[in-house]
Amino acid sequence: MSEIISIKDINFKSGSKVFVRCDFNTPMDEFYNITDDRRIRSAIPTIRYILDQGCSVILASHLGRPKNGYEEKFSLLPVAKRLSRLIDREIIFANDVVGNDAKTKVAALKQGEVLLLENIRFEKGETKDDVALAKELSEYANYYVNDAFGVCHRAHSSVHAITKFYDEEHRAAGFLLIKEIEFARNLIKRPIRPFVAVVGGSKVSGKLQALTNLLPRVDKLIIGGGMAFTFLKAIGENIGNSLLEEDLIEEATNILKKGRELGVKIYLPVDVVAAQTFSAESAIKYVSTQEIPTGWMGLDIGPASVRLFREVLSDAQTIWWNGPMGVFEMDKFSKGSIKMSHAIAESFATTVVGGGDTADVVERAGDADEMTFISTGGGASLELIEGKELPGVKVLLKAES
């Protein structure tokens, strides 16, 4: 793979405007208070670096998936306020993306100032990789920097089409994007061994390609979460009413077989927290995976599985974790995921956490500071591990000389 153009490769001309695509897709409560500002904090090194070059910065991001233009719950105004506090300077906020307010504020932007555009997905063309929208955005700035790893797997207008309007000397990847790619590449190509992958989440279908790509590279593989039940079914266990992807039993069998051929040890849960219904009021039982009663379903890994997995991790030098061990959103089914987070955080390994739900588990467990690296992108992180080329990264590669 060619080398990516870094922000450090660009000779920024003082007084220029720089368009920075960020990922400020942050969770908020019902009062629009940001509950986790990790993604905002992650963008700060790139913003500061550009300001230090004597430029002004135009920030663009999405938040959620708005369907019909402006919706208050998807506004980036709370992000502007939080970012202002974090970098201790005024953030000018535009009430639109390519409307009069944005254009007026971009034109008036002075050296050293920072402007945040409203949610870029309020423009319908964004998710369609619309070239006309990309051209309008490109007219705002002399340089383009992508620091939004979390959307690099999507060919969207502000990530993909916009790069057509900047040559190699005027487009680059920001510090966060480069860091994300380096961690993923090293994980796949140069892991320090023993390398253990911990894969959870609800569905095998979402992780199938990642599992296939990881198998020849890992020493041990732990499979938990809802997806484990398809594997347990494949080895003949009675899984009751637990989540099952029947059409993938054969694929699960093939993965287990391939693991044996490659000498990779694959570990599945040995016990679960079972309930008859998924609700806070439902009675629970701790049962072995061989004894899940008919009509009951496994919703978290049990204490014996936690002990087993902790033992498996004890000699690891590299750990990659993607996907919770149970339905962690509900307290009574979150213990397995929380304990797994503690076990990974306490290890002496290089620990890389895939974004999305897994990052939320780590935050909730209070282990964020103990992990080596927490990815800001769930889907993008997974696609890199799957060996796929990300559209937003491909357009930032140096031309083959």
From Swiss-Prot:
It comes from the Bacteria. GO terms for molecular function: ADP binding; ATP binding; phosphoglycerate kinase activity. It is an enzyme of class 2 (transferase). Its EC number is 2.7.2.3. GO terms for cellular component: cytosol. ATP binds at residues 207, 298, 329, 355-358. It catalyses: (2R)-3-phosphoglycerate + ATP = (2R)-3-phospho-glyceroyl phosphate + ADP. InterPro entries: Phosphoglycerate_kinase, Phosphoglycerate_kinase_N, Phosphoglycerate_kinase_sf. Substrate binds at residues 23-25, 39, 62-65, 121, 154. Keywords: ATP-binding, Cytoplasm, Glycolysis, Kinase, Nucleotide-binding, Transferase. Pathway: Carbohydrate degradation; glycolysis; pyruvate from D-glyceraldehyde 3-phosphate: step 2/5. One of its GO terms (biological process) is gluconeogenesis. Disulfide bonds: none annotated. It is found in: Cytoplasm. Its main location: cytoplasm. Pfam families: PGK (PF00162). Belongs to the phosphoglycerate kinase family. Monomer. This is Phosphoglycerate kinase. The gene is pgk.
